């Protein structure tokens, strides 16, 4: 393997991937088709092989169209999930978060509803980023070695050796793992030593001490300034506008850091996602019984594959690793399709009609009851997508370890939260939508709901605090290696029952 933490031009990936898709379309000719602006709401199970995925249904978010897809093999690639927990940005900036607002947890919810296992759903990521804009800190941390200090001018990193000793040997690793650094920020915040400031202006002072040649110094400062602004304008334009709004020149003033809201991203510094089959030559034999067949990146549901954020227990893929995993899953699905040439998806007209009625039900609910009140936003007969989302986020934030409690929770809090989630789940039937955009929001809410409950139930099942900087349990505030296992969750759509499975953590390296 090569070096880690190498700077990349990640914003250019989309162009490269789009070129590959364009080339594939050219090769396929009339057989190729790309459909955009389609919201996939459900996966379809084959009616002759009920444990096999045979397609999907959804609707256009721009036109009055209902889509039914039949397939020999299906790949779910919808990113992770944000806004399951309440974002810190409210009101004018509502929804501003570190992850794109359009990742609604569909990759997790669809696998779950299809009968698949999810793993590590308690392991959310909490990125420490620039306050309110969530701009990237990597360039400053890694490239320019920019110092970060608490409000009394001290460093929080390494300031709490006694508390972190509970998580040895992980807390002693170099570099310090992200959950440990985050936990140090939490401990520092509990002492009131906030805000945290990244002293970008100190980098300029360091350059002045290190470089005596005026021309070289000017060149170095110019490079620093252009790298900083370019990084934000490429990735997080709001970061640059936030500086301007606060009259901050990063060459002259420090910038505030803050831990963000919790997000689900199985390809970054956490490992939530689907329990997936590994390569035949590396996957331990104890895991094989979970899968209907041996194909790399296939979920526990036959014919359903995923990659990137969809694959659980496989953290730190980032951009390049997700790209590689995409290539791996592409080869796997081709092999699966070739091995199953005789298979023809069986989906009845009755099933197609049932899902159509289900998907568009929020329209009917709205039209039936909209005149009951003087304003359509508040109505005793239905709930709007926004109000459903607010309720979900409030429950998750206050009971399941959001920023509202400084990422802390407990069994009693989680039990109360799961009870409230069950009440919220009853209101899925009462979601209403006045247009296609709200219909999309309604189904995003449903997907986020399933992700939230999977998270809460997994956190309740785990009797330790394995990632204290992402979330910790007041009643199990330590690392317990007798609990060193994968906690998986399943959902039965027919009985509406959840089940927890524990699988051993078997090192393969």
Give residue ranges: language-model regions.
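Catalytic phosphate/nucleotide-handling subdomain of diverse soluble enzymes
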Residues: 295, 299-362
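Long, amphipathic alpha-helical stalk/connector segments used for oligomerization, subunit docking
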Residues: 339-434
């Amino acid at each position: 393997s090569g070096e880690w933490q190498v700077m990349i031009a990640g914003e250019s990936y989309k162009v490269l991937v789009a070129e590959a898709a364009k080339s594939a379309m050219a090769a396929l000719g009339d057989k190729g088709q790309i459909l955009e602006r389609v919201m996939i709401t459900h996966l379809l199970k084959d009616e002759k092989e009920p444990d096999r995925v045979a397609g999907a249904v959804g609707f256009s978010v721009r036109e009055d169209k209902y889509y039914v897809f039949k397939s020999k093999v299906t790949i779910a690639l919808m990113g992770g999930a944000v806004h399951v927990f309440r974002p810190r940005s409210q009101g004018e900036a509502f929804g501003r978060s570190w992850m794109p607002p359009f990742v609604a947890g569909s990759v997790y919810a669809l696998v779950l509803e299809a009968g698949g296992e999810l793993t590590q759903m308690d392991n959310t990521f909490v990125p420490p980023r620039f306050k309110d804009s969530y701009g990237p800190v990597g360039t400053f941390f890694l490239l320019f070695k920019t110092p970060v200090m608490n409000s009394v001018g001290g460093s929080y990193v390494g300031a709490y050796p006694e508390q972190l000793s509970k998580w040895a040997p992980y807390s002693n690793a170099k570099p310090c793992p992200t959950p440990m650094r985050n936990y140090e920020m939490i401990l520092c915040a509990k002492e009131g030593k906030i805000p945290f400031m990244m002293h970008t202006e100190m980098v300029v002072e360091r350059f002045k001490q290190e470089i005596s040649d005026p021309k070289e110094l000017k060149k170095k400062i110019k490079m620093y300034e252009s790298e900083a602004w370019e990084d934000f304008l490429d990735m997080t334009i709001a970061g640059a506008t936030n500086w301007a709004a606060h009259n901050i020149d990063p060459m002259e003033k420090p910038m505030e850091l803050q831990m963000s809201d919790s997000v689900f991203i199985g390809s970054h510094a956490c490992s939530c996602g689907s329990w997936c089959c590994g390569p035949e030559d590396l996957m331990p034999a104890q895991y094989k019984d979970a899968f209907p067949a041996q194909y790399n990146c296939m979920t526990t549901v036959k014919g359903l594959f995923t990659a990137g954020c969809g694959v659980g227990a496989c953290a730190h893929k980032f951009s390049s690793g997700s790209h590689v995993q995409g290539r791996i899953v592409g080869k796997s699905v081709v092999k699966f399709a070739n091995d199953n040439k005789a298979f023809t998806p069986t989906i009845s007209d009755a099933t197609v009609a049932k899902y159509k009625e289900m998907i568009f039900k929020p329209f009917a609910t709205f039209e039936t009851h909209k005149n009951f009140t003087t304003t359509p936003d508040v109505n005793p007969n239905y709930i709007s997508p926004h109000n459903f989302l607010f309720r979900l986020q409030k429950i998750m934030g206050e009971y399941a370890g959001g920023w509202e409690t400084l990422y802390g929770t407990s069994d009693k809090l989680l039990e109360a939260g799961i009870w409230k989630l069950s009440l919220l789940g009853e209101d899925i039937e009462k979601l209403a939508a006045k247009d296609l955009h709200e219909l999309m929001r309604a189904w995003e809410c449903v997907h986020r709901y399933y992700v939230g409950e999977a998270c809460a139930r997994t956190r309740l099942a785990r009797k330790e605090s394995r990632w204290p900087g992402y979330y910790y349990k007041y009643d199990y505030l330590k690392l317990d290696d007798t609990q060193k296992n994968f906690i998986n969750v399943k959902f039965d759509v027919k009985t509406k029952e959840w089940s927890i499975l524990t699988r051993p953590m078997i090192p393969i390296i």
